[in-house]
């Protein structure tokens, strides 16, 4: 036995190489073996690797020591481990000699953003890496605890399907919220368009574009997986049927996203048209007012009309100046109040 590691023996591990476990250190995650979840430690992981027992190691982020454990003890390729350390990766499948590395994206139910999951598919197990809580994985943990696995495929392929399927399904409730939000905005715009609505529309459009960027490569990725272009260890024809189901879901999601993007463009056009029509109405009313006062101003200016009441009642330069400026200021304030009440400046119409 290795000095300093009394709990572990050398052996041929999950990658077909000699496993030399390091110190029994607690990892930030959960180890699932035979439906039972326990706190993940390097010693426990090394044990299941040596015995080739099907397992699932679910990690909440990779610190430097955990990354070193995956690379040196489990002997995963350093390029894949480095990718798993840094989030912001595009969806992809990388095939290595002893394992397959996935980057899969889902949706965050509380917002219109996307989440990212890194998956290592090994001959006898699965390792997942994510940041923070992942509700999709919580559902998978619950299913495994109830022993709801797919019986006609290998345990690791079954687990991979459950994880990816649960992650992809998170898009549907988020897209349903998109639909409701777009309908609300369209009703609000037809009732009263505002600048704030335009900002919300652009935010939604950016979210859809971000979602489209992860959906399209994932659709192509699982198309290759379902058709057998990419071959996974222990993958059977029955397993490919399950991944074709994921591919079908991704096609539906991509079509929905494209439809919502077109719908948002139509709502933006509606906003612009509504604002333009409203501006035309305002200009029409102002033109009528100006047309009424134009001949009156011409006549009073042509004949030099003045108010005789001012003669003898307002004397001196300062009182006359104060009266004139005060009357002008009062006129401006009345007009501003009238325009605001009509919603022509500074707010909605009444």
Please name every model-derived segment.
Residues 4-235, 241, 245, 249-259, ...:
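Peripheral, non-transmembrane regulatory/ligand-interaction domains of membrane transport proteins
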Residues 56-57, 236, 286, 325:
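A generic secondary-structure micro-motif detector
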Residues 75, 248-350:
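Hydrophobic alpha-helical transmembrane segments and their immediately adjacent juxtamembrane loops
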